[in-house]
Amino acid sequence: MISGILASPGITFGKALLLKNEILSINYKKISNQDIHQEVKKFINGKNKTICQLQEIKNKTQQKFENTQSNIFEGHIMLLEDDEFQQKIISLIQDRNISSEYATKIIIEEHAKTLEQLNDEYLKNRAIDIQDIGNRLLKNILNIDIKDLNNIKNPVILIARDLTPSETAQINLKKVLGFITDLGGQTSHTSIIARSLELPAIVGTKNITEKAKNDDFIILDSINNKISINPSLEEIHRIKQKKKKYESEKKLLIESKNLYAITKDKHKVEIGANISTIQDINNAKKYGAECIGLYRTEFLFMNRNYLPSEEEQFNTYKTIAEEMKNKSIIIRTMDVGGDKNISYMNIPKEENPFLGWRAIRIAIDRKEILHAQLKAILRASAFGKLRIMFPMIISVEEVRTLQYELEKLKQLLHHQKIPFNAKIEVGIMIETPASAIIAHHLAQEVDFFSIGSNDLTQYTLAVDRGNDLISHLYNPMSPSVLSLIQQVINASHKVGKWTGMCGELAGDEKATLLLLGMGLDEFSMSAATIPKIKKIIRESTFLDVKKLAKKVLLQPTYNEVNNTINTFININNKNK
């Protein structure tokens, strides 16, 4: 049995189609001074041909998906049109007398290596995009035909080392049953595509392409993280029954998506969605989100060569406000820097980016960026229920500085007679032990907290979850992390404020009852998880889960925490 990283839930079975990536062998090639002009011309022609192809792929993608996917190719085109990128390659050809393809290979590998070394999973996965652009550009420089993947005739499970944006844009996705890849994580392109199409996917299997062959019969169970190659007839019969049951349960969950998350003894919590783009709102609505618990604005700042203007940001926030029709939207100010290095912002390279110049630290130092974003949010607040949230807070001083800047901008808009919500709520992310420990002070300064469980876990346990040697130590349900979460919730409630959570823990089925019992007021998660979490809450009793939380918080180890929760769930299931 093969497993990997669960990227998109579902169960499917069918024949394998193995996509083997062609590896281009580009060797060092010295050229004479007389050939330099011709090699530069060869590069420019190849670059222009690549841009035309990407524009065509972008147009096709807009028909298949929404702008969120076609925007990937906009970023690819922008890189190819970037003067600095072009000049680096041309300079190598001219200064070192090397062929256009070898110069291109060097620069592409430099770009990809820079991304691969980052700690941020999303940006690390963009290295595949760079390699995809490079592969296409090199083929065009060398006049090698690029194969057409649009001719899939029968339903298949696609198996690949990794799927690039340009490959998925060309594939006949109507014939795809699911995806399995050697590489990738939750934020890789394959995962994003699979979730948007609601197709089962398991990524990061390490070696599926070595184990499966074309036309092998594959069972892909991305609920239980199991892949089976050429199973027995008995296994096929079992998976058919399992798939039928899963589809039936999924249908019932979707039908009940708009029911509120209210326990049997009438305790209500709010369930929201985390989004990164305007297009994500469609999924949020589809799965019954009552609010947007986290809008990650940093994606507005990425895949471009300049800062988004106040006007561009205003139009984006206004659209989201109008789309959500008076439902709450928490807009987190840009969380970039350190590992999310945006070239045009000139963020210095740091030894330890997770402890470096990032998020609100950049905003306080670069007030023109902060002011443009806050003004855009304030202006958009006239069109819906927007809330502002600041990330990476460690002190009361930071909060007061940010509140002061916000008040100045409110006065400016008031003098300019520009409408905005003067009472817009302001909250902070609790994602550092520092902010959790002084939550009782911070609760006096803001309207709400939202716990970023991913970073809070990482900082509390001093564990880089991207480091394979120690990733097993990363555990958001360790007693130390749970203790801090409870401390934060209690601090907010003591002064009549509320606490939400927008990290992965908020959408973890096993953690739901515990967090509910701890008093969490709002859960924000990936949209597809919402119906299941709502159902778990509706089937629970607040009085019982409060007792569970009290018991769990007394446990000294994760195993004892886990056993306590499992025992509670098993007893509850028997009593249903």
From Swiss-Prot:
It comes from Buchnera aphidicola subsp. Baizongia pistaciae (strain Bp). Its EC number is 2.7.3.9. Belongs to the PEP-utilizing enzyme family. Keywords: Cytoplasm, Kinase, Magnesium, Metal-binding, Phosphotransferase system, Sugar transport, Transferase, Transport. It comes from the Bacteria. Its cofactor is Mg(2+). PANTHER family: PHOSPHOENOLPYRUVATE-PROTEIN PHOSPHOTRANSFERASE. Homodimer. This is Phosphoenolpyruvate-protein phosphotransferase. The active site is at H189 (tele-phosphohistidine intermediate), C502 (proton donor). NCBIfam families: PRK11177.1 (NF008382), PTS_I_fam (TIGR01417). The N-terminal domain contains the HPr binding site, the central domain the pyrophosphate/phosphate carrier histidine, and the C-terminal domain the pyruvate binding site. PROSITE patterns: PEP_ENZYMES_2 (PS00742), PEP_ENZYMES_PHOS_SITE (PS00370). InterPro entries: PEP-util_enz_mobile_dom, PEP-utilizing_PTS_enzyme, PEP_util_AS, PEP_util_C, PEP_util_CS, Phosphohistidine_dom_sf, PTS_EI, PTS_EI-like. One of its GO terms (biological process) is phosphoenolpyruvate-dependent sugar phosphotransferase system.
